[in-house]
């Protein structure tokens, strides 16, 4: 469990997977160490697994929204000196990147493929129906993943909803301030 693995920390190095990090540097997409859970410790397996599965994408959405608010505050109230325009632009671009990447992560993790939160969410919400089709999903998951990566599917399944969330968070942050 995360406690025994030393993962109950905000230190990012405890969560870095070296191969995933190298892939980020090489191809722009990578991964962190997966968070292991012990379903045997759950009091209500479906309900508690659902909570765990929703927590990741929800955290991504909260981070995206807070970064959008931060961006608007910095921009609207001129919290960064206009004399250092390049520094201001860099900070705003980083903040917008945080909004974008967290929207993409939330949407991606909601895809119902084994290993992603969307798979667990569907399994927990519709256990009897899901078990009827899960064998097929497991059998063809590699083919589905390859098709997802090498075709424009990713752009539509992840890109379009991510872009909509990004714009929504920026619009809401703009309307607040």
Segments predicted by a language model, with ranges:
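Hydrophobic transmembrane alpha-helices and their immediate loop junctions
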Residues: 1-177
């Amino acid at each position: 469990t995360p406690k025994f693995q030393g993962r109950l920390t905000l230190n990012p190095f405890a969560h870095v997977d070296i191969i995933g990090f190298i892939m980020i540097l090489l191809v722009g997409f990578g991964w962190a160490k997966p968070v292991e859970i012990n379903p045997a410790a759950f009091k209500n397996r479906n309900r508690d697994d659902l909570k765990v599965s929703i927590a990741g994408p929800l955290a991504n959405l909260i981070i995206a929204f807070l970064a959008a608010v931060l961006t608007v505050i910095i921009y609207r109230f001129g919290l960064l000196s206009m004399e250092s325009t390049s520094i201001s632009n860099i900070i705003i671009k980083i903040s917008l990147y945080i909004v974008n990447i967290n929207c993409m992560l939330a949407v991606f993790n909601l895809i119902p493929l084994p290993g992603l939160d969307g798979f667990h969410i569907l399994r927990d919400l519709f256990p009897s129906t899901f078990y009827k089709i899960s064998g097929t999903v497991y059998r063809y998951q590699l083919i589905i993943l390859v098709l997802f990566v090498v075709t424009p599917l990713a752009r539509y399944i992840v890109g379009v909803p991510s872009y909509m969330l990004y714009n929504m968070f920026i619009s809401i942050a703009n309307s607040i301030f």
